[in-house]
């Protein structure tokens, strides 16, 4: 466990979050979020960090991924039922900002074949990039299902203009152990991104969508 958050504290907070949810069942699957408050950081002067880490358990089961594929990838995905678009379908959007925005909204992330990825700015314009959803590369040596799972399990920390950030680390149907392991990975990775590591952390909380925040640090 990371030195500043004891195993006991983590398990206790996770139990509180999960039990709070059991008391009040919602009609949707609540996400569990890690909320971070930073200190001794100047977003104007200090380098704004950004980084991604893969968690052990998928934090958002409903996270949707669309493959922008060449012929081979489009044929492959038929067997595994993954949403896809080929180059012709992308060209039909005709760089229309509204349509590209709609596409960016429809899916949480995109994968693209090698032959397509370089053409995306030309075919679609900057829409996907602006939405922070520029596709990740999908090569022919990779298993498509495994790659989609990897994208679903990966979270991104990105420092913006404010000193707080939040990322999804799980959901309320997970076991204590799954959630603890994900939070542990996420916290350690985040701290490694910070200039002064733990000295930049003011507070850490976890909370479910509708639940009360539980302090870890």
UniProtKB/Swiss-Prot annotation:
Localization, per the record, is: Cytoplasm
Q: Which residues carry this modification: N6-acetyllysine?
A: 91, 106, 118
Instruction: List the PROSITE patterns hit by this protein, alphabetically.
Output: RIBOSOMAL_L1
Q: What keywords were assigned to this record?
A: Acetylation, Cytoplasm, Isopeptide bond, Phosphoprotein, Ribonucleoprotein, Ribosomal protein, Ubl conjugation
User: Which residues constitute the cross-link Glycyl lysine isopeptide (Lys-Gly) (interchain with G-Cter in SUMO1)?
Assistant: 118
Output a single Gene Ontology CC term carried by this record. mitochondrion
The record's Gene Ontology biological-process terms are: cytoplasmic translation; translation at postsynapse; translation at presynapse
N-acetylserine is found on: 2
GO molecular function ontology, one term from the record = RNA binding
Q: Which family does it belong to?
A: Belongs to the universal ribosomal protein uL1 family.
Task: Provide the protein name.
Answer: Large ribosomal subunit protein uL1
Native organism is: Mus musculus
What is the primary gene name for this protein? Rpl10a
